[in-house]
């Protein structure tokens, strides 16, 4: 699955609690809670000239690597790295709390959650419009750039985190009003500016500059995050999944000895040209989309997509039983 390096938000952490490994999950979250940068409170924005200004200079103390940033190595808050792994890590932590109900651990980690939300707002919603930029924040992010625009999936992550923070604050007897207000603000911004009613889909993002156009052909990550983070209402979920069904390429699985003739994979987008992380046939993206079908009430499509991904990976892949990153049908 290409876990070649320490990074705090690999999807694997989601699996610990369903497997009953609550202690392992807690160890993971504690270790990376200790990796959160505490100071300075903020810093300068310094584009990296060695990376054609496409990244921030990886230096602790710069804007992205200031208070709230979670470093890539456990129990070490001194290493700057270009990914925003905070978003997914905090989502995993919140899901862990929902599995375990561990109030004592919540209280211990509460400052980590607060600093994270402040960091996200400070760095990625600079204009305060409720739409957050996406800077290397999800698996597919390597070649995704939005130039400061408002992105559906990162805004959805921040909506859910703020909504849950308000609920968690109440459990601890704290005032969660600011988190609830931010969640309401984000939700309204997404619905007003990123829902494309004519097409029945959430846009990928809205340009920051120029005519502030909305990119109306999202990747599957936009669809499943909108559903998973509870941005989409039932009608929007249905229409968004119809977009996946009708607009995202479906690839039949054909193999010698395979008796099933109704298995199909999907690519992550309908974008061209093909390049890494922009248009792939990736197992995790396929099964996450299958989860969205389940969450959207389309269980038959969900099962068929899930089955297709597992059959291709575990039975037709390079190694029997493997859970691959990219499938054979990837270009």
Give the role of each language-model region.
Residues 1-107, 215-229, 238, 262-296, ...:
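Substrate-binding groove/exosite segments of carbohydrate-active enzymes
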Residues 24, 88, 112, 157, ...:
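Charged catalytic carboxylate motif
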Residues 36-37, 113, 137:
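Aromatic-lined carbohydrate-binding surfaces of glycoside hydrolases
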Residues 81, 85, 105, 112, ...:
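Short, well-structured alpha-helical patches and their helix-loop capping segments
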């Amino acid at each position: 699955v290409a876990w070649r390096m320490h990074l705090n938000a690999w999807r694997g952490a989601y699996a610990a609690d369903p497997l009953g490994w609550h202690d392992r999950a807690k160890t993971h979250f504690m270790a990376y809670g200790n990796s959160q940068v505490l100071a300075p409170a903020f810093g300068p924005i310094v584009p990296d000239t060695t990376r054609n200004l496409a990244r921030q200079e990886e230096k602790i103390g710069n804007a992205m690597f200031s208070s709230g940033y979670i470093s890539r190595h456990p129990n070490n808050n001194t290493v700057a790295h270009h990914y925003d792994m905070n978003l997914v890590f905090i989502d995993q932590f919140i899901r862990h709390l929902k599995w375990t109900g561990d109030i004592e651990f919540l209280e211990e980690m509460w400052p980590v959650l607060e600093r994270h939300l402040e960091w996200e707002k400070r760095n990625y919603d600079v204009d305060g419009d409720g739409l957050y930029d996406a800077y290397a924040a999800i698996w597919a992010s390597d070649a995704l750039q939005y130039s400061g625009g408002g992105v559906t999936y990162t805004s959805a992550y921040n909506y859910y985190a703020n909504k849950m923070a308000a609920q968690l604050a109440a459990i601890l007897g704290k005032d969660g009003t600011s988190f609830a207000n931010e969640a309401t603000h984000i939700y309204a911004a997404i619905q007003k500016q990123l829902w494309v009613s004519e097409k029945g889909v959430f846009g990928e993002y809205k340009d920051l500059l120029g005519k502030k156009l909305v990119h109306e052909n999202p990747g599957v990550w936009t669809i499943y995050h909108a559903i998973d983070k509870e941005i989409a209402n039932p009608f929007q979920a249905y229409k968004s999944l119809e977009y996946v069904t009708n607009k995202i390429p479906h690839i039949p699985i054909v193999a010698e000895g395979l008796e099933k003739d109704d298995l199909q994979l999907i690519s992550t987008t309908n974008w061209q040209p093909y390049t890494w992380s922009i248009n792939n046939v990736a197992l995790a993206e396929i099964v996450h989309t299958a989860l969205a079908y389940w969450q959207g009430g389309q269980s038959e499509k969900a099962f068929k997509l899930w089955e297709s991904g597992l059959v291709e990976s575990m039975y037709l892949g390079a190694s029997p039983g493997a859970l691959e990153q990219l499938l054979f049908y990837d270009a």
